[in-house]
């Protein structure tokens, strides 16, 4: 559907995104159990995914000698955070933390940092598995653990990339594309249709965009008012209006953020299909696995899910049970790129796509395109909100511009961006 609003069914969507890809083996959590009553076909599918999860991601062979993690710092300035890692031999990497680090820094300092110190960074796959066991960290599963864990992983990958003289994409896979096509992600579900449309038009107008995602449903997350509901009939009005406004050449996606119950999700899914939307994201709550599967099997429009997921188990179940078309782990929420690559490889094993969710702010857009550039089964368009950020940096190999709907992927070592050293020096270490 790239560049076209012509309708497409689930199978056609999957074939298009996979055309240039090959199936990869993957790595991650091993030892998930196969239900005793599972059919032979299901047992075979689960076993295939488990085998995929056993394979490593980081290219250890690029580093002949141990890379011992000597220090791991969390730095702050004006309520924003950086992570800086240094090896025993003096190599350094820096990442930009998610905006919620102001609430999660104790987990970084007390639950995660002690486990990483003294470890060989070449063992990053194993470290990311075992840190969940240390200090019963799995009890904190979800964004509370995933966000600080990803922040640490990004800094280590940046360090390793600089040591190897390679971009992060070449550490976790093979560069599949020099540019990543993006869609404009919009919000404003709480606003009337006319105001929403005006804001959507303004957002799209800022960049050379050929794909757009809108919000549907009435998830009122932005208020403490327990009786708050969205504008009546907003979804039914805005879906056809957005198609009419942007025409058939704009690829459209829709995101409900888990708002609907199954019957309403079916109804809205049919509406989206009528107006040639390319997928329906989080139609029901992310962990309602059986409902997600039912939607995927009953609706022709592809179903996307995984932004909120925090373990491999949900993806494993949905993929094994033919219950999901597009996997959407978030680089930050899910605990980093290596874990996200493992999900991508699971999806590839059954011909499914990955379109990662992207957290806004910081350098999330560059982290996301590095990941996507390494994935053979990446979908057609990937999340983008803007280049606005508090971070002071230079991008010598990739301009901050969307050109013909695409962002150039940095090719420099690490994440390919250079933080302003004077700005970094202004940050102070967070004490545990």
Specify the residue positions occupied by each region the protein language model found.
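C-terminal extensions of enzymes
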Residues: 17-20, 390-432
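Shared catalytic-loop signature of beta/alpha-barrel
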Residues: 114, 119, 126, 130, ...
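N-terminal secretory signal peptides and thylakoid transit peptides that target proteins
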Residues: 2-21
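Glycine-rich, aromatic-flanked loop segments that form ligand/cofactor-binding clefts
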Residues: 153-191
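Metal-dependent enolase-superfamily TIM-barrel catalytic cores that perform enediolate-based chemistry
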Residues: 178-298
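Metal- or metallocofactor-binding catalytic centers and their adjacent structured scaffolds
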Residues: 46-47, 88, 92-163
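C-terminal segment of N-terminal export signals and the immediately downstream linker at the start
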Residues: 27-75, 92
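Conserved, mostly hydrophobic/aromatic
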Residues: 90, 152, 165, 255, ...
């Amino acid at each position: 559907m790239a560049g076209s609003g012509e309708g497409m069914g689930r199978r056609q969507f999957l074939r298009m995104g996979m055309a240039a890809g090959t199936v990869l083996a993957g790595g991650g959590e091993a030892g998930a159990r196969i239900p005793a009553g599972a059919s032979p076909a299901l047992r075979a599918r689960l076993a295939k995914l488990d085998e995929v999860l056993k394979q490593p991601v980081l290219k250890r062979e690029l580093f002949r000698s141990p890379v011992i993690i000597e220090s791991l710092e969390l730095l702050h300035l004006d309520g924003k955070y950086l992570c800086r890692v240094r090896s025993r031999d003096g190599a350094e990497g820096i990442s930009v933390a998610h905006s919620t680090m102001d609430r999660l820094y104790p987990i970084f300092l007390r639950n995660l940092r002690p486990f990483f110190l003294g470890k060989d960074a070449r063992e990053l796959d194993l470290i990311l598995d075992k840190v969940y066991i240390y200090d019963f960290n799995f009890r904190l599963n979800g964004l509370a653990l995933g966000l600080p864990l990803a922040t640490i992983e990004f800094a280590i990958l940046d360090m390793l990339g600089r040591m190897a003289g390679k971009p992060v994409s070449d550490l976790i896979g093979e560069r599949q594309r020099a540019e990543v096509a993006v869609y404009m992600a919009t919000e404003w579900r709480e606003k009337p249709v006319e105001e929403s449309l005006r804001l959507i038009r303004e957002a799209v107008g800022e960049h050379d965009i050929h794909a757009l995602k809108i919000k549907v449903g009435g998830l009122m997350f932005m208020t403490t008012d327990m009786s708050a509901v969205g504008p009546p009939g907003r979804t039914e009005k805005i879906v056809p209006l957005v198609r009419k406004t942007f025409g058939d050449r704009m690829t459209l996606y829709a995101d409900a953020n888990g708002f609907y119950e199954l019957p309403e999700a079916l109804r809205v899914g049919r509406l989206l299909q009528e107006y040639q939307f390319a997928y329906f994201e989080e139609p029901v709550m992310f962990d309602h696995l059986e409902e997600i599967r039912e939607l995927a099997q009953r609706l022709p429009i592809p179903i996307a899910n995984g932004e909120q997921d925090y373990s491999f188990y949900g993806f494993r179940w949905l993929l094994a049970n033919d219950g999901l078309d597009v996997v959407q782990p978030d680089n930050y929420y899910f605990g980093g790129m290596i874990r996200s690559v493992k999900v991508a490889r699971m999806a590839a094993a059954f011909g499914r796509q990955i379109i990662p969710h992207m957290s806004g702010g910081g350098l999330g857009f560059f982290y996301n395109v590095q990941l996507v550039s390494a994935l053979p089964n990446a979908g057609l368009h990937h999340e983008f909100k803007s280049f606005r950020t508090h971070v002071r940096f230079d991008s010598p190999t990739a301009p901050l511009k969307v050109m013909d709907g695409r962002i150039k992927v940095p090719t420099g070592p690490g994440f390919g961006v250079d933080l302003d050293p004077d700005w970094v020096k202004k940050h102070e270490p967070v004490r545990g």
